[in-house]
Curated annotation (Swiss-Prot):
Enzyme nomenclature, EC number: 2.4.1.21
Annotated organism of origin: Synechococcus sp. (strain RCC307)
Function of the molecule: Synthesizes alpha-1,4-glucan chains using ADP-glucose.
UniProt xrefs under Gene3D superfamilies: Glycogen Phosphorylase B
Protein family: Belongs to the glycosyltransferase 1 family. Bacterial/plant glycogen synthase subfamily.
Reactions mediated catalytically: [(1->4)-alpha-D-glucosyl](n) + ADP-alpha-D-glucose = [(1->4)-alpha-D-glucosyl](n+1) + ADP + H(+)
GO annotation, biological process: glycogen biosynthetic process
Protein name listed in UniProt: Glycogen synthase
Ranges for region Disordered: 475-507
């Protein structure tokens, strides 16, 4: 099966959030199943020096009133084909932000549609988040291409209807309120990045004002859990941590713990309970809860806390103040360092994720891979990946709390600290979480089933019927001219017009 991924990120070249991990790791897992999988993304300025990109493009075209070119290169790790959309609007180091962000990604979606119709035609075009939300709108009338849309974070929804009309001349009834809504309506299949998140977004609490539409399309909505690259994140072979270890020999984890304490300026003590947090410092991630409970928790226990990340100024200020007041026990590193993040995963005893909402979460999977026990709020993908630990039966993977309240987080942290004092059962818990399968191979099988389902769909969905009702029929004379043109040239180059209808060049 020919599958084209369209996304704004692809790890390791471009990674801002979890979407980059998915687009970088899922395609090779699908390729292992025999699919021809390729990725198309904007040609950001930094990519031309990172990748071996030929000077000549493989294809040139025009859309939204401007020329663009598509260059073919290879993924540096997997060797899969990567297509870069070249245009001056993507020059420079910027990935997101700027006054022209809406135009940039709407243009990318438009260019991708042109490329999929006329250059390399996939059977499935897999779109990711609002940046590619207009692709299903423009593709919905092509019976040869099925579209899948993945929701990584429903909170970010793209440009609104009035702006899309100005940029694309696409009428309001083909858009929804914004690009996210348009994709939800027109994509043949929609998936969220965890089963629980797929259910949560259908409620007012997590639906970001789209719960009505999500309930309407629930027949084509599903949740598929993300995975991790188990080869790149393997404590038994990781050359970027001070000592390797495995379930057969955990002694290397103590070496990593000592190295972490030394690196972060903490008091070196192998018996101290160390909690790590690696995250964007935003309200979604629950950092405000940590600041509310840290002082009391440090006073009650001999715990040390390590935080790595960057984000909102008020949260950074609070973490800096906490580190100043509790030197040697609370350390915050207000930037992002990949090597240090690995050391935190390997050297901590527990990993904190008190998220307000969490579509899937990758950090808790990485922490368990390194034998670090997660302390999480039961929300989104954290529900699917971290069942509560029950000491009496030795079941579960971590310590959980339900309400977004400081007292609930405090109670979960105390339970983790008390469990750590019973080292025999704690060691069993470490070994168990290290053996859980969170590989992309497992997730790829679920995506494979979804792709086969959408390509085998013979009857249109109710949503497709509703969309077809808005299609504008051609006058009889145009239909006759089109039939004559098709008889003369059965394989024309096709383009989309602002109404989302397929047409011929010059037609």
């Amino acid at each position: 099966m020919r599958i084209l991924f369209a996304a704004a990120e692809c790890a390791p070249m471009v990674k801002v959030g979890g979407m980059g991990d998915v687009v970088g790791s899922l395609p090779p897992a699908l390729a292992e199943l025999g699919h021809d999988v390729r990725v198309i993304m904007p040609g950001y300025g930094k990519l031309w020096s990172q990748l071996d990109v030929p000077s000549e493009p493989i294809w040139r075209a025009q859309t939204m009133g401007t020329d663009f070119a598509v260059y073919e290169t290879r993924h540096p790790k997997t060797g899969l084909t990567i297509y870069l959309v070249g245009h001056p609007v993507f020059d420079g180091e910027r990935i997101y932000g700027g006054e022209d962000e809406d135009w940039r990604f709407t243009f990318f979606a438009s260019a991708t549609s042109e490329f999929a119709w006329n250059a390399w035609k996939p059977q499935v075009l897999h779109c990711h988040d609002w940046h590619t939300g207009m692709i299903p709108v423009w593709m919905h009338q092509d019976p040869e291409i099925s579209t899948v849309f993945t929701i990584h974070n429903l909170k970010y929804q793209g440009p609104w209807r009035w702006k899309l009309e100005r940029m694309t001349w696409c009428p309001w009834y083909m858009q929804g309120d914004h690009t996210m809504a348009a994709a939800l309506l027109y994509a043949d299949r929609v998936n969220a990045v965890s089963p629980t998140y797929a259910q949560e977004i259908r409620t007012p609490e997590y639906g970001e004002q789209l719960e009505g539409l999500l309930n309407y399309i629930s027949g084509k909505l599903r949740g598929i859990l993300n995975g991790i690259d188990v080869e790149a994140w393997n404590p038994a072979t990781d050359s970027r941590i001070p000592a390797t270890y495995s379930t057969a020999d955990l002694s290397g984890k103590a070496v990593c713990k000592r190295a972490l304490q030394e690196r972060m300026g903490l008091q070196v003590n192998p018996d101290t309970f160390v909690i790590g947090l690696v995250s964007r410092l935003v309200d979604q991630k629950g950092v405000d809860l940590l600041l509310q409970v840290a002082e009391r928790f440090l006073a009650y226990t001999d715990t040390q806390i390590v935080v790595l990340g960057t984000g909102d100024r008020h949260l950074e200020s609070g973490l800096w103040q906490m580190a100043s007041q509790h030197s040697g026990r609370f350390a915050s590193f207000l930037t992002y360092d990949d090597d240090l993040s690995r050391l935190i995963y390997a050297g901590s005893d527990a990993f904190l994720m008190p998220s307000r909402f969490e579509p899937c979460g990758i950090s808790q999977l990485l922490s368990m891979r390194y034998g670090t026990i997660p302390v999480v709020r039961r929300v989104g993908g954290l529900v699917d990946t971290v069942p509560p630990y029950v000491p009496a039966t030795q079941e579960g993977n971590g310590f959980c709390f339900d309400r977004y309240e400081a007292i609930d987080l405090y109670t979960a942290l105390v339970r983790a600290w008390e469990a750590y004092r019973h080292q025999d059962s704690w060691q069993q818990l470490m070994k168990r979480v290290m053996q859980v399968d969170f590989s992309w191979a497992r997730s790829a099988l679920e995506y494979d089933r979804m792709y086969r389902d959408v390509c085998g769909m013979k009857e249109p969905t109710p949503e497709a019927d509703a969309v077809a009702a808005f299609s504008i029929p051609q006058p009889p004379e145009q239909q006759a001219a089109r039939a004559a043109a098709e008889a003369a040239d059965p394989n024309p180059q096709r383009r989309f017009n602002p109404l989302g209808l397929l047409r011929r060049n010059g037609g």
